[in-house]
Amino acid sequence: MNRGKMKKVLALMLTFIFVISATACGGATKFDAEAYVRGVMDANYKQKYDEYAKARGISEKDAKAEIEDTLDEQVDTELSGLEALGDFTEEEKQEYKDMLVKIDNLAKYEVKEAKEDKDGNFTVTIEVTPSDVYQTLEDNSTAVAQEMMDQGQDVSQADASMFQDLLIQSMQKSIDGNTYGDTTTIEIAVTKDSDGQYGISDSDME
């Protein structure tokens, strides 16, 4: 799993809107930081939406829609930077999205515990076993491009379709050859603002 992406996911989803609210009996709903972080990560990396939906107070269908909408926006943003190649078809966008999901599924992590401080903020400990899938993508892209040129294709004049083919093949090579590094432990600070809304701390975004 790419650490940078993981923190981006947490930053995006933890700031969605989880506000401590009053229960019917007049008490406060206890924020379960460990369950929520695990739910966020499982929804994004494993397409498991039950714990995330429960924490958000929404249906699993709506939880899935939220995550997929976020991924659709990611795909559109990334491909919009390649306008010079021409337009990507909806089928090509979906194929790229499917490959991103495959890469996400390689993520290995375990949410260990959440410790609350006196101010009601949390430090969540996560064990991460990093994948090298993104680290090998550049080398695999070079290899695939060479294979295409050996077949007579001029990759220097690639349009959207040819680039898509190169990209998908490269991603698949990285997935097929994926290996993992040593397990490391990271800590994510989940803090509460003046409105009672939780979010990831700015320091964890550095």
Feature-to-residue mapping (PLM):
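Bacterial N-terminal signal peptides that target proteins for export
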Residues: 2-13
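Enrichment for repetitive, rod-forming helical segments
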Residues: 14-15, 196
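C-terminal motif of bacterial Sec signal peptides marking the signal peptidase cleavage site
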Residues: 21-24
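Subset-of-secretome marker
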Residues: 28-206
